[in-house]
């Protein structure tokens, strides 16, 4: 089962409101999801703190267990709208392995 972190559209016509959800990639866009981890309201001003609200610990958890984020969610992360204190565990393991390999060579 491929799991994605994506936006699910809610709200009314011409008044979009999105939930940031973890869902099976085969599920419909607005259909069943595993967990709601945040929300995005594009109608709010860009400087409003409630425009994008995400549970960062749950986002980190899902990324660490292999969930793939969609382009828009990745954009939120890259722009600093959603902050991740540390990289996912897979990256940390590679760094430790690289440091061990360099230590053995020297």
UniProtKB/Swiss-Prot annotation:
GO terms for cellular component: cytoplasm; small ribosomal subunit. One of its GO terms (biological process) is translation. Transmembrane segments: none annotated. The keyword Ribonucleoprotein applies. One of its GO terms (molecular function) is structural constituent of ribosome. Keywords: Ribonucleoprotein, Ribosomal protein. It comes from the Bacteria. Pfam families: Ribosomal_S16. Belongs to the bacterial ribosomal protein bS16 family. This is Small ribosomal subunit protein bS16. It comes from Wolbachia sp. subsp. Drosophila simulans (strain wRi). The lineage of its organism: Bacteria, Pseudomonadati, Pseudomonadota, Alphaproteobacteria, Rickettsiales.
